[in-house]
Structure formats: C-alpha cells, structure tokens
C-alpha cells in the first residue's frame, strides 16, 4: 500500500509539468532553480519529486535507499485517515523497515519497542521518533555527500541531448538489418 504512495511521491515529473512562475515551460532553467532549492535544505529536496528521485538514486549507490523509502512511507502514513488503512500501512512499514526480518531494515534505536500489539492501535505519529532519527541520519550524513555528487552537480541531460546523432542512428539501423537477416 505505502509502496504505491512512495512510488507516487518519488516519481520524476515529466518535463511538460515543469513551468516557470509565468507558466512557460523551461526545464533547464527550472532544473537550476530546483537544484538551488535542494541545496538549501533536505526538507526542500524531499518536497520535490525530482529531488527525491535523484536522492534515491544516490542512496541506492550508497546501499541506503531504505532510509528515504522509510521516511516517505512515514509521511504517507501520517496522512492516512482511515483506521483500517492505517493498521495495514503500520504493519507494512514495520515488516518492511523495522522488524528483525525486514527486507529493507533501517538502522534506528527503539525499533524493538514497536510490537505487533502496538500496530493494532496505530496513530498518525507512532513512527515520528524513528522517522526523525532517519531524517537526521540523512541530513547529517548522506545529504552532504549527495550535494557533492554528480547526481546533484551535473544537471540531467534533456531528451534532445540524449538522442543519438543521425549518423549513429543510421549505423545502428544498418547493423540491426545485418543481424536480422
């Protein structure tokens, strides 16, 4: 359940959704604005879907992607109003990130205090202390390294830049015809 929300929160916005304040599309200009905003605080980075995506890519390379995924799952959990959904999400967060058998266990103090019994009576802030620990871990450890990484320093190439030159496309087509015959 929260995995869909995490995916939704961290999905990169398509270039057509990126606009300057006047509504005109300007992905290169917006990218510079975004990276400046991301550099100002981890909070700003986590509010921007493209920022979250790049930060996730960075954390994946550092083998600590579970930290941002846990943080996002907790944010989604806090917004849940339906009690049954809250119970399901609480159990999923616990089983995915906090239990001894968790597939993506985060390193936080106090996780053992959360038990299955507590999960039956969830409340929106039940993971807050653990989420704060992970936020601080990211803020004072991973975030500073991210700001020095290529994922932050080098702007994403636009689709036009990523297209192959015409000669390479023609050569690739010729090669595919040779191997397909």
UniProtKB/Swiss-Prot annotation:
Pfam families membership: RGS
Residue ranges annotated for the RGS domain, each copy included: 41-156
General function of this protein: Regulates G protein-coupled receptor signaling cascades, including signaling downstream of the muscarinic acetylcholine receptor CHRM2. Inhibits signal transduction by increasing the GTPase activity of G protein alpha subunits, thereby driving them into their inactive GDP-bound form. Modulates the activity of potassium channels that are activated in response to CHRM2 signaling. Activity on GNAZ is inhibited by palmitoylation of the G-protein.
GO cellular component: cytosol; nuclear body; nucleus; synapse
Name under which the protein is recorded: Regulator of G-protein signaling 10
Main location: cytoplasm
Domain of life per record: Eukaryota
Native source species: Mus musculus (Mouse)
Xref: PANTHER family: REGULATOR OF G-PROTEIN SIGNALING LOCO
Phosphoserine modifications at: 24, 41, 176
Alphabetized PROSITE patterns for the sequence: RGS
Signal peptide: none
Sorted UniProt keywords: Cytoplasm, GTPase activation, Lipoprotein, Nucleus, Palmitate, Phosphoprotein, Signal transduction inhibitor
Residues covalently joined to lipid (S-palmitoyl cysteine): 74
Single GO MF descriptor: G-protein alpha-subunit binding
Spans through the membrane: none
Biological process terms in GO annotation: G protein-coupled acetylcholine receptor signaling pathway; negative regulation of signal transduction; positive regulation of GTPase activity; regulation of G protein-coupled receptor signaling pathway
């Amino acid at each position: 359940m929260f995995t869909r929300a995490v995916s939704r929160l961290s999905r990169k916005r398509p270039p057509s959704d990126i606009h300057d304040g006047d509504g005109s599309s300007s992905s290169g200009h917006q990218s510079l604005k975004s990276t400046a905003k991301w550099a100002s605080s981890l909070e700003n980075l986590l509010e921007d879907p493209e920022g979250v995506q790049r930060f996730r890519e960075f954390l994946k390379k550092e083998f600590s992607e579970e930290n941002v995924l846990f943080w996002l799952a907790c944010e989604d959990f806090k917004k849940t109003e339906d009690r049954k959904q809250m119970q399901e999400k609480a159990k999923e967060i616990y089983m995915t990130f906090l239990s001894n058998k968790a597939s993506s266990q985060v390193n936080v103090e106090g996780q053992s205090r959360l038990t299955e019994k507590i999960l039956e009576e969830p409340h929106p802030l039940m993971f807050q202390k653990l989420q704060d620990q992970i936020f601080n871990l990211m803020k004072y450890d991973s975030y500073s390294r991210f700001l020095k990484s290529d994922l932050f320093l080098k702007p994403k190439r636009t689709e036009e830049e990523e297209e192959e030159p015409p000669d390479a496309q023609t050569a690739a087509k010729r090669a595919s015809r040779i191997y397909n015959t």
